[in-house]
Amino acid sequence: MGLTWRDPLYMDAGMEKKINRIRWRLEHGAGSFRLYLVTISTSPGMQLDIVSAADLKQRVIRRRLPMIVGVAGSYEDALDRVQDMLADALAATGTPDIRKYLENRQE
């Protein structure tokens, strides 16, 4: 089973040119130790998780990874992508419910 990606992804500036290669590497288990993925959280009461792409080397994490909504080159950049998502959710819905905003945009 492959990874689930949200389109369009939230990503760092300059990653647009590399995103197809990044996706291919992650889909085929090549991994990348310098990437962080922002995913929909599976934990009750939480909205998003930030996961190191290196963790995808573990089968259990790879199989259970929820939808990927963002890609970043560092943990700090991943936090910036979450802030971007929050700003978009607030502008579109007036509430800070990022998860609901992203799920509704996906449909």
Residue ranges and their predicted role:
Residues 63-106:
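Short, compact, well-ordered microdomains
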Residues 4, 8, 20, 60, ...:
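Generic, low-specificity signal for short hydrophobic/alpha-helical stretches with a mild N-terminal bias
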Residues 1-26:
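Negatively charged, low-complexity tracts enriched in Asp/Glu with abundant Ser/Thr
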Residues 24, 59-61, 103:
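Hydrophobic alpha-helical segments, principally membrane-spanning helices and signal/leader peptides
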Residues 31-67:
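Short aromatic-glycine-(Arg/Gly/Cys) micro-motifs in beta-strand/loop hairpins
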